């Protein structure tokens, strides 16, 4: 069965290029703020703080992701590249920035983080659609029913890229420019992100100790990433 061929999404608006990745990130932060605000207000708390927290998370997340990527690659110049929005770096940077903003507003981190738990899961699911839109973060070669080839991915899923950039072996007999079908791990993560959101949304009204729901999110997110890493093509497994 022939694999589905992926083509990246981009729209030129005058001098501005709007990419699927950019739209995915924008929607992720907007949806995250909406969900977190709704949870706080449902608990009878002031949700206005989430505007400041979201801005802090955006700035801290972007800086953390780029810095983490530069450390992984050993290239300080990677901070200025268009690539390198690494999840774990973004999560760490976003949390650090959010803690500072929350403390500045005189609120408790555990109180806000519980409201952010389902919001983070929803934002993650939506954000991964941005990775899909540009053809980034795909998986290992596969010829199954859901296999997808990325001839214009970031980077294209060619033999040369899979071997040189991701360290995969066993394809030396194929021409370097051969485009391989792979696991669409971006879509797997989107689906798992929505499952996490459904679980956390169901648990949001449970009266447990402050910080409990955020802890559940961390466990679910860790399990999700652990599982998907076995299918991802990237060579920075378990840390990227």
Model-assigned labels for residue ranges:
Residues 1-240:
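A feature for loop-to-transmembrane-helix boundaries and adjacent hydrophobic helices
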